[in-house]
């Protein structure tokens, strides 16, 4: 447990927008991104290749593609601004790149929420990468 706490504290200082992404997932999908989506299917987690395995994995595929289209900042590191208005997440700020990252994260969180019924932990958690070989373009 202590190791997990230390890792979480280290991540807070290192991965700005990834922590925000976790927060958005918690707010919108009511699940922990770290414990639910960090090693799921072919695309949820670090990297990604192959065919998305279900609608949840496709959320991660689309999120990866969205990050790939962002230019001018680092989607995983740079902090963005957002607010909540009438239960909706509203991305803000003057930096178009950071706003785009926020929109990517918001869309993924909504996708996770809308596809909770496809989430199959037993089948796709720590899915073997050998089953993720076919390349799929964004």
Curated annotation (Swiss-Prot):
Subcellular location: Secreted
EC number: 3.1.1.4
Cofactor: Ca(2+)
Residues at which Ca(2+) binds: 43, 45, 47, 64
Name this protein carries in UniProt: Acidic phospholipase A2 Ts-A3
GO cellular component, one term: extracellular region
Role description: Snake venom phospholipase A2 (PLA2) that shows a moderate inhibition of ADP-induced human platelet aggregation when tested on platelet rich plasma. Exhibits high hydrolytic activities and prefers the anionic micelles (dPPC with deoxycholate) to the zwitterionic micelles (dPPC with Triton X-100). PLA2 catalyzes the calcium-dependent hydrolysis of the 2-acyl groups in 3-sn-phosphoglycerides.
UniProt cross-references to PANTHER family, sorted A to Z: PHOSPHOLIPASE A2 FAMILY MEMBER (PTHR11716), PHOSPHOLIPASE A2, MEMBRANE ASSOCIATED (PTHR11716:SF9)
GO biological process, one term: phospholipid metabolic process
Distribution of this protein across tissues and organs: Expressed by the venom gland.
């Amino acid at each position: 447990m202590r190791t997990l706490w230390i890792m979480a504290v280290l991540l807070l200082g290192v991965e700005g927008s990834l922590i925000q992404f976790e927060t958005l997932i918690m707010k919108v999908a009511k699940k922990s991104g770290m414990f639910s989506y960090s090693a799921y299917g072919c695309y949820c987690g670090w990297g990604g290749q192959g065919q998305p395995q279900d609608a949840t994995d496709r959320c991660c595929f689309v999120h990866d593609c969205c990050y790939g289209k962002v230019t001018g900042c680092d989607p995983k590191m740079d902090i963005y601004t957002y607010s909540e208005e009438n239960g909706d997440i509203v991305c803000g700020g003057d930096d178009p790149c950071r706003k785009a990252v926020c929109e990517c994260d918001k869309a993924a969180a909504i996708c996770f929420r809308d596809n909770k019924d496809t989430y199959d932990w037993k089948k796709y958690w720590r899915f073997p990468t050998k089953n993720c070989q076919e390349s799929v373009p964004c």
